[in-house]
Structure formats: C-alpha cells, structure tokens
Curated annotation (Swiss-Prot):
Family per record: Belongs to the bacterial ribosomal protein bL17 family.
Positions with biased composition (Basic and acidic residues): 140-152
Region Disordered: start-end pairs: 140-171
Source organism per UniProt: Leptospira interrogans serogroup Icterohaemorrhagiae serovar Lai (strain 56601)
Subunit structure: Part of the 50S ribosomal subunit. Contacts protein L32.
Protein name, as recorded: Large ribosomal subunit protein bL17
Entry's Gene Ontology BP terms: translation
Matches recorded under InterPro entries: Ribosomal_bL17, Ribosomal_bL17_CS, Ribosomal_bL17_sf
Gene Ontology molecular function: structural constituent of ribosome
Entry's Gene Ontology cellular component terms: cytosolic large ribosomal subunit
Length: 171
C-alpha cells in the first residue's frame, strides 16, 4: 500500500519544507533563476506556476478590488518580501499575460560530485537578460539612497534648535 505519496516530503518536516519552498520561490522571482536539486526544483516549480497564474488573474481590468486584494494576500502567504510581490504582479505577470502555462523550465546539470545528487536550474521561460536585471537593481538602489538622503535632510531641517535656557537644570 502506497500511503503519504501526495506530498513530496523532501526528507523534512512540514514547517521546514514550507520555509524551504517559500524561500526558493522568493529567490526564483527575485533573481529569475535558481540552482538546486531536481527533487526540490520539481516541487518549487508547481508552486511557482500557481502563484504566477494567481498574479495573472489581477491583470483583468473588470476585476473587483476585493478579489484583487484576495489574490495579493494569497500570494503573500508564500512570498514574504513585498518587493518581490510587487515585481510578480507588475512585471512577471505582464510578461506571461498571453501564455497559459509553462512559465518555468527545469534544466538538468551534471550530478554533484560530492554526493552524486541530480542538480538542475529552475528559471522563468521569458527571463530578462542579466545585464538588464543588474541595471534595474542599480537604479533601484540609487533611488532608495536618494530617498534616504532627502529624508535625513528633512529631519535635520525640521528639528527644532535646542534652547539652553528652556532645558531646566535641577536647582
């Protein structure tokens, strides 16, 4: 009798397995490519495809705001990083708008030397070039640093000058 075969356990308990899958999905959407063992990649692939489909549902214009919010919250159960969620809904979902599946692919690599495990790469099929990804990250960092500097400047200008007379000393 084959029991307990609906879920790939990956030799981990449920909490560890869920954390592993969530982290790998986040990395996949952030870097658009991850490398790991074949067994892990197959599990992550199914979850990632479901999340992309969920994000694509928000592209429909006549969708109720409650449904859009529900879709976003369902995705945020798996992906904790808000920047990655925004990227999924605004960038990745639009790239796959015309496709009805097959958003990811698993490429097999040579077995790992140390333990002879099957290794592969999971990547998005319509992946951006590495140079454009790096440019986007650099631009994003520059924008963030400018915002931080402006915030610091406003804090300095808004801080009231300290009046020595008003600060009371114990008499």
């Amino acid at each position: 009798m084959n029991k307990r075969n609906k879920v790939k356990h990956l030799n981990r308990n449920k909490g560890h397995r869920d954390a592993l899958i969530n982290n790998m999905i986040t990395s996949l959407f952030k870097y658009e490519r991850i490398e790991s063992t074949q067994a892990k990649l197959k599990v992550v692939r199914s979850h990632a495809e479901k999340l992309i489909t969920r994000a694509k549902k928000n592209l429909v214009t006549d969708l109720k705001p409650e449904v859009q919010l529900h879709n976003k919250r369902e995705v945020m159960k798996r992906i904790k990083d808000r920047e990655v969620v925004v990227k999924l809904f605004e960038d990745i979902a639009k790239r796959f708008e015309t496709k009805n599946g097959g958003y990811t692919r698993v490429l097999k690599l040579v077995n790992r030397i140390s333990d002879n495990s099957e290794v592969g790469i999971l990547e998005l099929t319509s992946r951006k070039e590495r140079s454009t990804l790096l440019k986007e990250r650099i631009e994003k960092r520059e924008i963030q640093t400018k915002a931080r500097e402006e915030k610091r400047a406003t804090r300095k200008s808004n801080s009231a000058p300290v009046n020595k007379e008003t600060t009371s000393k114990k008499k």
